[in-house]
Amino acid sequence: DRICTGITSSNSPHVVKTATQGEVNVTGVIPLTTTPTKSHFANLKGTKTRGKLCPNCLNCTDLDVALGRPMCMGTIPSAKASILHEVRPVTSGCFPIMHDRTKIRQLPNLLRGYENIRLSTHNVINAERAPGGPYRLGTSGSCPNVTSRNGFFATMAWAVPRDNKTATNPLTVEVPYICTKGEDQITVWGFHSDNKAQMKNLYGDSNPQKFTSSANGVTTHYVSQIGDFPNQTEDGGLPQSGRIVVDYMVQKPGKTGTIVYQRGVLLPQKVWCASGRSKVIKGSLPLIGEADCLHEKYGGLNKSKPYYTGEHAKAIGNCPIWVKTPLKLANGTKYRPPAKLLKER
């Protein structure tokens, strides 16, 4: 008789790294990682995703919407996730804004971070009768309203003295909390400045003016810049020689804010009432279809593997986990080379 011993074997192209034995050849593996390719951004599956703050506000930037430009008034949909599609928000129409003096560029991004956002139905203060008045409310030909008349931002009132065009010591107005559902109140305010001749004509004082806002433990001070600004046109409107500085303050439920001002103040009017949290991620529009995950570098991803390699960046949703190198799960046995046949005895 012949007695032969041996083991089954097969070629093994699979190598896995183990914690105890280093690289090991195995008979089978399951890949656990994928390398995504860049795609368009999408709506996040199972939740509401917000692109533009106001999808129905045509030809409006998010800053237009946040400031209440007359032709950019509309409903902001609730959303659990938001796309930050204007990394550095562009300017708003109506009036040239000195963006670099305040955090106003952050206002649209602040609003994006809330799930529910609504504009109050009435004004937070009576601007015409504010301290230092009576005032008439200034408008801009570059800011037409729905009736094609001159208008201004819904969140602010440009307080121009009616007849007491004289210099004034700092005046104080209290800004009450008027939101009704325990939301954060975002109150927008600012001030106007121009050349000396215009300041004297509008306000009776051509000197730099002082302004202070205070709310929720945060106090901010400003001094207006008086000078000959070059004419600037916003969104094809009329050339403007003046500039406005716009800021905002966040008031917590029941908390009163204060604004101390001199001439040229833009008093708060309608305020934003915001609640809940919305996850924000940098991306681009339009949103096409749905995806399991939104990734800053790759756009919309559908999760096919538990891990991914490639560019590491912020992601929201049901996302694979980033790893530096590909991972494999061994689903076979350790490879053994073919056994040599024993010689006949």
From Swiss-Prot:
Glycosylation (residues): 25, 59, 145, 164, 231, 302, 331
Role: Binds to sialic acid-containing receptors on the cell surface, bringing about the attachment of the virus particle to the cell. Plays a major role in the determination of host range restriction and virulence. Class I viral fusion protein. Responsible for penetration of the virus into the cell cytoplasm by mediating the fusion of the membrane of the endocytosed virus particle with the endosomal membrane. Low pH in endosomes induce an irreversible conformational change in HA2, releasing the fusion hydrophobic peptide. Several trimers are required to form a competent fusion pore.
Pfam families recorded: Hemagglutinin
Organism whose genome encodes this protein: Influenza B virus (strain B/Yamagata/16/1988)
Assembly information from the UniProt record: Homotrimer of disulfide-linked HA1-HA2.
Family: Belongs to the influenza viruses hemagglutinin family.
Membrane topology, from the record: Single-pass type I membrane protein
One of the GO BP terms on file: virion attachment to host cell
UniProt-listed InterPro entries: Capsid_hemagglutn, Hemagglutn_HA1_a/b_dom_sf, Hemagglutn_influenz_A/B
Highest taxon listed in the record's lineage: Viruses
Further facts: Major glycoprotein, comprises over 80% of the envelope proteins present in virus particle. The extent of infection into host organism is determined by HA. Influenza viruses bud from the apical surface of polarized epithelial cells (e.g. bronchial epithelial cells) into lumen of lungs and are therefore usually pneumotropic. The reason is that HA is cleaved by tryptase clara which is restricted to lungs. However, HAs of H5 and H7 pantropic avian viruses subtypes can be cleaved by furin and subtilisin-type enzymes, allowing the virus to grow in other organs than lungs.
Keyword set, alphabetical order: Disulfide bond, Fusion of virus membrane with host endosomal membrane, Fusion of virus membrane with host membrane, Glycoprotein, Hemagglutinin, Host cell membrane, Host membrane, Host-virus interaction, Lipoprotein, Membrane, Palmitate, Transmembrane, Viral attachment to host cell, Viral envelope protein, Viral penetration into host cytoplasm, Virion, Virus entry into host cell
One Gene Ontology cellular component annotation held by this UniProt entry: virion membrane
Lineage: Viruses, Riboviria, Orthornavirae, Negarnaviricota, Polyploviricotina
Protein name: Hemagglutinin
GO molecular function, one term: host cell surface receptor binding
SUPFAM superfamilies per record: Viral protein domain
Subcellular location: Virion membrane; Host apical cell membrane
Modified how: In natural infection, inactive HA is matured into HA1 and HA2 outside the cell by one or more trypsin-like, arginine-specific endoprotease secreted by the bronchial epithelial cells. One identified protease that may be involved in this process is secreted in lungs by club cells. Palmitoylated.
